[in-house]
Amino acid sequence: MSPKIIEQLAPKGVLRVAINLSNFLLVSDRSADVNPAGVSPDMAVEVARRLGVGIEYVEYKTPGEIADDAGKDAWDIANIGAEPQRAEKIDFTRAYCEIQATYLVPPGSSLKSIEEVDRPGVRIAVSERSAYDLWLSRNIQSAELIRAKGLDASYDLFVSEKLDALAGLRPKLMEENEKMAGSTILPGQFTAVQQSIGCGKNREEGLAFLVAFVEETKTSGFVADLIEKHGVVGCLSVAPPA
């Protein structure tokens, strides 16, 4: 292993990994007295193993908070969705896995397709600064985005304000669908959230190592094995190779 790579990715001799605890698909065990477990932490463990260093988790409640700490020497790598706004401060690999994002609509809704949601007068509840919120912010032309801080809060807002649609990741919307009798998850997806590994800017050797790592773990079946290990088959899918 090149000393330059270790210097760029683990300058303190330990790999500090920013983990987004709000993504229940990627962090499936968030017990307070143990390290987080799931596909995302296991990917980080493998990065640290290949670097030959220890690992330290830096836990965040939202991905937006991770992005806020970019460039502040708070973490070395970050496992979050790759979005253009975040790429202004973070260099990303290609995605190692993907999650479908779509809408939940209430009982009796006239909205039957994703395309119908983006029209004047439609109000969409969304978790603020999530990867799919960033996508919607760039792409929604006519509907109004109503933001809440966190996944559960966005559902509560959707219900309390009687909004027209709730944006979210399909597996989480399936849970909300069970809570709201008569609600419907619209078919298809408006985007697929790309889960990637990021590092700080100007770490060319370190980034190249991470890029190669992600591609190798996709093609070798390592990512697929993690998805099966953590019981999220059908919720997460291995991203296509670069």
Which stretches of residues belong to each language-model region?
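Ligand-binding cleft/hinge of the Venus flytrap
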Residues: 27-33, 44-54, 93-94, 120, ...
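A ligand-binding cleft/hinge motif common to bilobed small-molecule-binding domains
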Residues: 64, 81-89, 159-191
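Flexible hinge/capping segments at coil-to-helix
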Residues: 96, 105-123
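Ligand-binding clefts/hinges and TM-proximal coupling segments of bilobed small-molecule sensing domains
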Residues: 1-7, 131-148, 185-186, 215-242
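Hydrophobic residues within well-ordered alpha-helices
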Residues: 47, 69-71, 117, 157-159, ...
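Short, well-ordered beta-strand segments
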Residues: 16-20, 104, 123-126, 166, ...
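Extracytoplasmic small-molecule ligand-binding "clamshell" domains
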Residues: 1-81, 86-88, 147, 220, ...
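Periplasmic-binding protein-like
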Residues: 21, 97-108, 153, 170-215, ...
